[in-house]
A protein has these predicted regions:
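Metal-dependent phosphodiesterase/phospholipase catalytic core, i.e.
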Residues: 1-62
Length: 62
């Protein structure tokens, strides 16, 4: 199980929500199958629908 907090710790130099979405896509491409959102991203550009966007980024893998 991949946790959002793990992705954020592994990529601690991220400065935007868009970078987080790219990191999630990368994790999915590497074979991660399950994803849990255990924290809310605290970026200035984090949208109100951040959970939907994180899920979409993880499942799209594009």
């Amino acid at each position: 199980m991949l946790y959002l907090s793990e992705v954020m710790m592994k990529n601690h130099d991220m400065s935007s929500f868009e970078e987080l979405k790219q990191a999630l896509k990368g994790e999915a491409r590497q074979g991660q199958m399950f994803f849990e959102m255990d924290v809310k991203p605290q970026f200035d550009d984090t949208p109100t629908d951040w959970q939907d966007q994180c899920e979409a980024a993880f499942t799209s893998r594009d």
